[in-house]
Structures are given as C-alpha cells and as structure tokens.
Amino acid sequence: MKKIFLIVFIFFLQKTTSQKIYKDYPLSKIIEETSGLEIINNLLITHNDSGGEASLYYMSKEGEILKTRKIESASNKDWEDLTKDEKYIYIGDFGNNFNNRKDLKIFKVPIDINSTEKNEIISFNYPEQDSFKINRNTIYDAEGLISIDDKLLIFTKNRAKKITELYLVPKYPGSYDAKKIGTLEVNSIITGADYNKDLELLALTSTINFNEYYLITINNFSLNKKKNYKINMFEIPIEKTQVEAIKIITHKSFWITSEDESTSDYARLMKINL
C-alpha cells in the first residue's frame, strides 16, 4: 500500500497580471450556472450548479452543446465540480453554503455513455464537523475535486480564513470519513480545481471578494512526496463575474468557465494563457 504523506504547504505568493484571455465564447442559457469542467474524447464537459438537472453537457471547444447526458438515479442538490480517471467520471455534490448538509456525496459514473454499469455513490462527511447549524462562514463547504492516484481529493472553501483544506476519499462506493491531509494558504476562496498527472500540475481558481479572480498553479504536486510547495497566483483579467471551473491544457494554457452574472448576459467559456 502506498504511503500518503501529510502535505505541508509553504505560502510563497508569486502574483502577476501578465496573462491574457486568448479565447472567449458565450455559453447557452441551458448551462448558465456552469460549475465544473472536464475533457473526454476532445469534448469539454460541464454541469450546472445547485438546483439544475442531473445532467452532463458535452460541448465543442467553442462552447456549443453537442450532447446532453442525464445521470440516472441522481439529483443535483449542489453539484460543484467534476473529475475523471481512465474509466469513470466523478461528480461532486458537496456544495454546503449554509453548513447544514449531512448528505455530501460524489456520483461515480462510467465514462462510456453506452455502459450498462450502474452509477454509484460515494458518501462522506468531515469528521471534524460537530455543528450543523446554519452558518454562512462555514469551513465545510467545497468547490474543488480532483482524481489523483487511486483517491479523490476535495478542496474546501473556507470563507473565514481564506484557506483551503484538503480531504481524501476513496473511489469506491460507500460511506466514509474524509481524511484531512493538509492546508493550502491561498489567501482566497477556492472555486474550482484540476490536476494533470502527466504534468504533475495542480491548478485552482479562486476569488477574494467575488470582484477579483485568480488562477493558482502548483508544480510537481503529488500525494507521495513529503515536501513544501511553491504557490503561483495569477490574477485573471476579467470583470466581475463568478469563475467556477478550470481544465488544464498545458503548463501555460487553461480552459475556464464563469457563470451568468449581473455584469454579463451569459455564462462564458474562456481559454487563458499565462
């Protein structure tokens, strides 16, 4: 069994605004609350935030919806992110804006749309949470999910301390205590996550006050290396919006999506270059 080290993070902020939005496409009203991003068979995949249909939307790299996939035996209480491995898509239904959810889960769905394999549920809780009273400053909300090795890694959204805590859960169906393995001092609130195994690159999106948005990168990220990490933080040159998802293309190029906000008439798909 592989040993998973407690990850220790050193906050070394390298902040710049030199990146550019290289491409910018409007998204359909059907996905106006886009809140996750993946790539499968050269198609981008997204889903809506809370209250939408329990569906995945497959779209071109110009943002056109080409296919809608309804997720059977699932509901969308507050889907926040998705990730994948070689065989499955994992959808994080763990939005917890008011601190009171006791039904946090991740849906495990075959990548193959024609598969007869049934969808499965990975339920979890934060073992440190001892109160479920409504609290807008909850530290048990999350918007980031990645697949890494044989685990799923959840990034919490701590509004009070502007940090993210990292929790591991298995990829197998069942009910689990999520295992806290580290804290990342990002001085902001995490809104999306992605990991590229080949590049060993972790990428996050974040905000401070929903007026400024950032892209965060950490190189050589691994669960099996006990080390300190350098955190690179780049301001995204975008007006007030709500950046919700990220997908790595290369070390210097990323797809991001933003929700439909009052300052725009539509959600957006953007390609950003550092």
Each model region followed by its residue ranges:
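Bacterial Sec-dependent N-terminal signal peptides
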Residues: 1-22
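Sequence/structural signature of beta-propeller domains
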Residues: 19-274
